[in-house]
C-alpha cells in the first residue's frame, strides 16, 4: 500500500477481461457518489460444456445474492476481480489485519469490515459496462477445491446474516437430498405421497431459482444450458462442498490447506 501513488486502489485478476469503458464508468460513479468502496459484477467466459455451464449457473446465483444483499443494505460478498476502495479507507480498516492466516478472501473480509464500520461508504456498481469476465475451471476436481476454499471462509465471517443465509441454503439442500433418498426406502403408500411432495418441492425450487438466476443472467448478458440437470446436481455438490470445507483439506496454487 505505501507504493500506491493514487487515492483509489482498483483490483482485478491477471486472467480477467475488462470492458473498454470499465475505468471510465467506475470513475464517473465514484464522482457522483460518496463512496469509498465499490463492488462490481463478475461473470464467466464459457465454452459449450456441461462443466462450464454448471459453473455459470452457480456463479450467477452468487452474483445475484451479492446484488440482492446490497439491495437490502446487508452486503456480505464481493469479488476481488472487480473491486475498488480508497487508500484512506483501507488504512482506517487496518487493511487485511485479522485474516492474514486465511488462504483467500481478503476482498470479502475487507468488505465486511467496511460494512461494519462505515456502511454508508460501501456501494455496488450495477452497470453492464463494468462487468468483468474471467475463466471457468476445466475439471471437476479444481472446481470442487475452489468452492471448498470459498466455503471455508464462511466460518470466520463477521457477518451473521451471511452465516444464517449459508445455513438456510445448506439445510434446504440437505432436505432435498433426504427427501430424494426417502423415496427409495419407504413403503409404497408412503412413497406415493413423498413423490408428490418431492416433485412439488423440486418444481417450486427450480421455478424460484430459475427466475432469480434468469434475472441475474439478463443483467450479465449470459446464457446457460443444462439448467434442469444442473439444478438437480447442485444440492449434492453444494452439500459435499460444505461438509468437506469443515473437515477436509484442499489444494490451491500447489499448496494444501486444512
What label would you give each PLM region?
Residues 1-2, 111:
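Short, conserved alpha-helix that lines the donor NDP-sugar binding/gating region
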Residues 9:
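Short aromatic/hydrophobic "clamp" motif used to bind/position activated sugar donors
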Residues 12, 25-97, 151, 224-238, ...:
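Long helical/loop segments within the catalytic core of UDP-sugar-dependent glycosyltransferases
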Residues 13-17:
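The conserved acidic donor/metal-binding loop of glycosyltransferases
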Residues 21-23:
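Acidic donor-diphosphate engagement hotspot in glycosyltransferases and nucleotidyltransferases
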Residues 30-63, 91, 97-162:
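Catalytic donor/gating beta->alpha subdomain of glycosyltransferases that bind UDP-sugars
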Residues 165-249:
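Membrane-embedded multi-pass helical conduit in multi-pass membrane proteins
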